[in-house]
């Protein structure tokens, strides 16, 4: 879908660039596939702030998305494409041959009326799901499982995809958007195609209020605080903070590596931090 620009009739419209969602369904979601979503505002059960700069967002209902695609060899027709406030991608409502309704992530080039199916050996076309071991090398995929049967975890946000670049001893080699190359079991399911809404990265909110609608409150810089509030606080006049950037609790930030799961290091063939050649 294309981007939508606006005439500068007000200050908030001047810089505004949003995704044109005119092709999406304009009604309410399927009630049996939704549930209420409680807005915490960054507070815990004591009412204390545990996540700063959150709160005041628009009320949402959660849509149940089928990330597992366990209904094998039963074709489904795309009823409509919908907006989902809980994610950056669009979602598709599909109706199986037996009448069951389900939501899936909508890939690019999937239209209303198309047919999708999940199975061990199905056609390589957008929306179809199958094990990585049965896909041709070079295929573009999304919603990739990391453990068989767990449900898709990799490449689920707007415009995201991974590419199957090879196989090795029962494992599939994936190249991710970050540049990382990773081993995943060939039995893991993935869906063909790239995720919808690739223009999401080009939007411009135009005004602070749009961030507030999404629950984002003003993020105060450490150098603007007092010494009691932040390691960068205080000083006469404006200062640079005087040290490498840290969090309010003194932990290094802005580039400090935080990955500590050594058990899965063996599955990373090429780190996303390696210099691009």
Curated annotation (Swiss-Prot):
Disulfide-bond pairs as recorded: none
Example of a GO MF term: structural constituent of ribosome
GO-annotated biological processes: cytoplasmic translation
Region (Disordered): 222-277
Keywords: Ribonucleoprotein, Ribosomal protein, RNA-binding, rRNA-binding
A cellular component annotation (GO) from this entry: large ribosomal subunit
Family in the record: Belongs to the universal ribosomal protein uL2 family.
HAMAP family for the chain: Ribosomal_uL2_B
Role description: One of the primary rRNA binding proteins. Required for association of the 30S and 50S subunits to form the 70S ribosome, for tRNA binding and peptide bond formation. It has been suggested to have peptidyltransferase activity; this is somewhat controversial. Makes several contacts with the 16S rRNA in the 70S ribosome.
Subunit structure: Part of the 50S ribosomal subunit. Forms a bridge to the 30S subunit in the 70S ribosome.
Protein name: Large ribosomal subunit protein uL2
């Amino acid at each position: 879908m294309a981007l939508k620009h606006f005439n500068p009739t007000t200050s908030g419209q001047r810089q505004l660039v949003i995704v044109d969602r005119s092709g999406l369904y304009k009604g309410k979601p399927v009630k049996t596939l939704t549930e209420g979503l409680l807005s915490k505002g960054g507070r815990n059960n004591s009412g204390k702030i545990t996540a700063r700069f959150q709160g005041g967002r628009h009320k949402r209902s959660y849509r149940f998305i089928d990330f597992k695609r366990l209904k094998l060899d039963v074709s489904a027709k795309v009823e409509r494409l919908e907006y989902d406030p809980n994610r950056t991608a669009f979602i598709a409502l599909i109706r199986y041959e037996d009448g069951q309704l389900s939501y899936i992530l909508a890939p690019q080039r999937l239209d209303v009326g198309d047919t999708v199916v999940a199975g061990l050996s199905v056609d390589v076309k957008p929306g179809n799901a199958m094990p990585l071991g049965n896909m041709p090398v070079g295929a573009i995929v999304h919603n990739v499982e990391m453990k068989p049967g767990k449900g898709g975890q990799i490449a689920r946000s707007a415009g995201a995809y991974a590419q199957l670049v090879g196989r090795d001893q029962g494992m599939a080699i994936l190249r991710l958007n970050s540049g990382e190359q990773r081993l995943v079991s060939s039995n893991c399911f993935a869906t063909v195609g790239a995720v919808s809404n690739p223009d999401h990265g080009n939007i411009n909110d135009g005004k602070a209020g749009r961030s507030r609608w999404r629950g984002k409150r003003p993020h105060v810089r450490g150098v603007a605080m007092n010494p009691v509030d932040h390691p960068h606080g205080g000083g006469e006049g404006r200062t640079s903070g005087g040290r490498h950037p840290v969090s309010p609790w003194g932990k290094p930030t802005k580039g400090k590596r935080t990955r500590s799961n050594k058990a899965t290091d063996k599955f990373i063939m090429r780190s996303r931090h390696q210099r691009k050649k």
